[in-house]
Amino acid sequence: MLFEIVCSDYTQTLGGIRDVDLVLTSPPYMNARTYDIGCTFDFLDYQKLGDAIYQVLKPGGTCIMVLDAPVRNWREGKGSERGLMPWRVMLDWADRIGFRVPDRLAYGRLGLPGVYSGRFRNDWEPCFWFEKPGAKAYFDKTCMDTPSGRHNTPKLITSRRPDGTVGKRVSSGRAVTEGVKRQGTHLWYGNVGANHDLPELYMSGHPARFCSKFAADMIQCFCPPEGLVVDPFVGSGTTALMAIKHGRRFFGGDIQQQWVDRASNICKAWLDSILYPF
């Protein structure tokens, strides 16, 4: 299986697989969009999703999940607030389910122009990094390294120690020997609008895509070559396309047949362009 996309909800999609290397996904946000099918999530749904993901991951497997919440009147008498659901989900998955949370990440994207009275424009979304204990997780961020254009000469650099004192050392490693400028940080920026992403993904018309560069980085960083990537909310097929483009297998599902068809067609078209280039 190079890729397979089925029409099913997340419980069915995740119910028949095991030994997954990476789940890369963005589930519906609570009280945000309905996707024309009355689909919204509450805390119980997120709990069920976490349980299902934990079951399908192999020991040492990783889940990267982009999850935010809109501004609403969530609490009586408090006025409008940014929803706290993402952080409740993170704590629930860590404390109740048992996921390891190595760090916190951020998915940056330009918010819609506007005045935003009383708050700032939202240009990022929480990106949660979960690991299933039991084995060493795959992690290789060299895929995000870029050449600096020159070989750096060793030089004296300083850094602050935990006790507050400043230490000194001579720079070394790939930054010096190969002229590598490392790009991997906690923050990924990516736009999904016209002329900012792959045209086949932009033209899909999905209302809640994430950037293909973000998906490509996550897949190469957290899933070994020929490993299995899963997205139970496949949408336009960004995760699927980036998985097969970068030598990983993919399995995913969506509750709407139109997105299953579009994502499958996008992946098939890319494979055909490789197998039959003329």
Task: Label the model's feature ranges.
Residues M1-R262, K268:
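Core catalytic lobe of class I
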Residues N265-F278:
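Conserved phosphoryl-transfer catalytic core
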